[in-house]
Amino acid sequence: DKYFKKYLDNYVFLELMPHYIKREHLDFMRGVPMPVKKEFLKELAGEEGIKIQYFIEGMIDLIGLDSSFRYAPQYINFLNYVNKDIPKVIVSLAIDFAKEEQLIHAAVLLRAALRINRDDPDALYNYMLVCRNLYNDSDDDDYIADLKMEVFESLKHLKEVRPEFAMTYYFLGFAYINAGRYSSAAREWKTFVSLSGPCEERGEIQGRLTELEIPVKIEQAYMDVINGRWEQGLAVLESYRGDEMLKGWWPLYYYLGV
């Protein structure tokens, strides 16, 4: 939330007119402040007033900007009342914004869709992609680390709700590589290969799996040492000490040092 809450200052709050609440049977919205962007306030002076669409957009933004916002439950009820397929609508809008490189707005919308339905696979996948693009465009270490965690958590959840989706395992492999967890990366990529059909990514990952064979053996040997199987683990690690291909590869010497 800390990267999004600053945008709350762009909104002001109004209340629905009593006659509108009565006409639309919206008793659950009585006394609930409705968010609207400041730029739309000028329309209050018009004959038609502020369009309900602006309130809908504001509610979506608010639940995406602040996951603990006080009136989020009422906003979600209202959005579902307006359109029972509202998460699909929001995801579609987010994809459009992402295509236009408006990544922050896309992320906010996808966070909102996930607040309405945390198991929505399309929202999870696209939120992951947007977060990847956001951290790839940044040089702030804390920001990058936080968004990498968002990517990782989204992928793990997506794996639970849609285990047959091959691309989840493709991206999970890279997430584990970034964390230096080679055995886990190999496991996810093998699953990707088994689930995917002929595609460019499949050939790429088959090549990466070959490259991972030695790092996986070294990582497993390190785990042997950690778990008390000293001789077995050190024998494997020492066997790679003079390997020219691994010269300068810090994980090997880190494991040997440990």
Protein language model regions, located:
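Short coil turns that delineate tetratricopeptide repeat
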Residues: 84, 118, 162-163, 180, ...
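TPR alpha-solenoid repeat register
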Residues: 123, 168, 201-205, 216, ...
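Canonical positions in the second alpha-helix
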Residues: 113, 157-158, 192, 240
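TPR-adjacent "capping" and linker segments in tetratricopeptide-repeat scaffold/adaptor proteins
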Residues: 44-47, 73-91, 203-216, 243-247
